[in-house]
Regions:
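A short alpha-helix-loop-beta-strand transition element characteristic
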Residues: 150-156
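Local cysteine-cluster metal-coordination motifs and their immediate loop/turn environment
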Residues: 77, 157-178
Length: 181
């Protein structure tokens, strides 16, 4: 249901790079009720301001306009079910401190992670552990760790627009540029 599919092609490239199987399924119907600025059924424009500016606008009291309600909860629940079915031991997701700041993305907060970690563990009979290794790290620290590990950043995409090149103006472009500086 996103306005662009660029992240999907990048996910495929990254899975191929690491030689891992990528499993995907269409969850568009689940998000068809959300009309935030990221969704194709929305006429709202993606903000061309930094997350800090967006958080300032909301006074840190509500999510930013690119928040998809409970998206990570839905993704993590589905991933836990698939992981258990495939005899995996853990599900890992990339929540980080910057996304949790100022209530921007409530499903990236440490309290959300703790609640989901318990729910996933209990809901799978102790079969799946949820991990969020970046939950207390900012994007600059994550980029530094990725560079140390030789992450193929050229295969990644952060921009909320789906063009050939990042727009350089949306919150994710601005934060990515700052993280690499």
């Amino acid at each position: 249901g996103q306005k662009h599919k660029k992240e999907l092609s990048c996910a495929e490239k990254i899975a191929n790079y690491y030689g891992v199987r990528r499993i995907s399924f269409d969850v568009t119907p689940l998000f068809s009720y959300s009309h935030n600025s990221l969704m194709e059924n929305s006429d709202k424009a993606v903000p061309k301001t930094s997350y800090a500016e967006q958080i300032e606008e909301t006074k840190g009291q509500s999510p930013v306009s690119t928040y998809v309600p409970f998206r990570n909860g839905i993704f993590l629940s589905a991933a836990a079910g698939v992981a258990l079915s495939l005899d995996c031991e853990r599900v890992v997701y990339g929540a980080h401190a910057d996304d949790a700041a100022g209530a921007a993305y409530p499903d990236c907060s440490p309290s959300f992670f703790d609640a989901m970690k318990t729910a996933v563990y209990e809901g799978t009979g102790g079969g799946i552990t949820l991990k969020a290794p970046f939950i207390h790290m900012n994007k600059a620290d994550i980029v530094a760790e990725g560079l140390r590990l030789h992450v193929p950043y050229e295969l990644t995409w952060s921009c909320y627009e789906g063009g050939d090149k990042p727009c350089g103006l949306c919150g994710t472009c601005r934060d990515r540029e700052a993280a690499f500086a």
